Amino acid sequence: MIREERLLKVLRAPHVSEKASAAMEKSNTIVLKVAKDATKAEIKAAVQKLFEVEVEVVNTLVVKGKTKRHGQRIGRRSDWKKAYVTLKEGQNLDFVGGAE
């Protein structure tokens, strides 16, 4: 059993993009920014507990940070983890519905 405190730290924010919107409409998949050390099991448990929906599968990937310049200095943005969470048939979760 995963502690509730950990579940709250796993999910960071919804990732809103054209690709994420298309995935939601086409395959009932939500895209989230998650903690870099989060596992698929933790992500699944957190989504089910916090949003009260049934999760079918979780796919994850690590987005590499871009190299950026500020004048002569070269820096690098942090890497972050993205999760594609596919909900079971009939389940619905709408992040941007309140913005319309």
From Swiss-Prot:
The gene is rplW. One of the early assembly proteins it binds 23S rRNA. One of the proteins that surrounds the polypeptide exit tunnel on the outside of the ribosome. Forms the main docking site for trigger factor binding to the ribosome. This is Large ribosomal subunit protein uL23. PANTHER family: 60S RIBOSOMAL PROTEIN L23A. InterPro entries: Nucleotide-bd_a/b_plait_sf (IPR012677), Ribosomal_uL23-like (IPR013025), Ribosomal_uL23/eL15/eS24_sf (IPR012678), Ribosomal_uL23_CS (IPR001014). One of its GO terms (cellular component) is ribonucleoprotein complex. Part of the 50S ribosomal subunit. Contacts protein L29, and trigger factor when it is bound to the ribosome. SUPFAM superfamilies: Ribosomal proteins S24e, L23 and L15e (SSF54189). One of its GO terms (biological process) is translation. The keyword Ribosomal protein applies. Disulfide bonds: none annotated. Keywords: Ribonucleoprotein, Ribosomal protein, RNA-binding, rRNA-binding. GO terms for molecular function: rRNA binding; structural constituent of ribosome. NCBIfam families: PRK05738.1-1 (NF004358), PRK05738.1-3 (NF004359), PRK05738.2-4 (NF004363), PRK05738.3-2 (NF004366). Belongs to the universal ribosomal protein uL23 family.
